[in-house]
């Protein structure tokens, strides 16, 4: 079953992206390097609900 998750910037705390994941195949939290428009650089984004 796919669930919707938010990706939150680890340095500034803003929620920049909305995505989905399959919780059965990937039960752990997602960590992705994405662009943060508030800081104007690529930062680590963590899964938040």
Swiss-Prot record:
It comes from Streptococcus pneumoniae serotype 4 (strain ATCC BAA-334 / TIGR4). The keyword Disulfide bond does not apply. GO terms for cellular component: cytoplasm; ribonucleoprotein complex; ribosome. The lineage of its organism: Bacteria, Bacillati, Bacillota, Bacilli, Lactobacillales. Belongs to the bacterial ribosomal protein bL33 family. One of its GO terms (biological process) is translation. NCBIfam families: PRK00504.1 (NF001764), PRK00595.1 (NF001860), rpmG_bact (TIGR01023). Keywords: Ribonucleoprotein, Ribosomal protein. InterPro entries: Ribosomal_bL33 (IPR001705), Ribosomal_bL33_CS (IPR018264), Ribosomal_bL33_sf (IPR038584), Ribosomal_zn-bd (IPR011332). This is Large ribosomal subunit protein bL33A. The keyword Isomerase does not apply. Transmembrane segments: none annotated. Pfam families: Ribosomal_L33 (PF00471). GO terms for molecular function: structural constituent of ribosome.
């Amino acid at each position: 079953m796919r669930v919707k998750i938010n990706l939150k910037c680890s340095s500034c705390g803003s929620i920049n992206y909305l995505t989905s994941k399959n919780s059965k195949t990937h039960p752990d939290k997602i960590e992705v390097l994405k662009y943060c428009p508030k800081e104007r650089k690529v930062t680590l984004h963590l899964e938040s609900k």
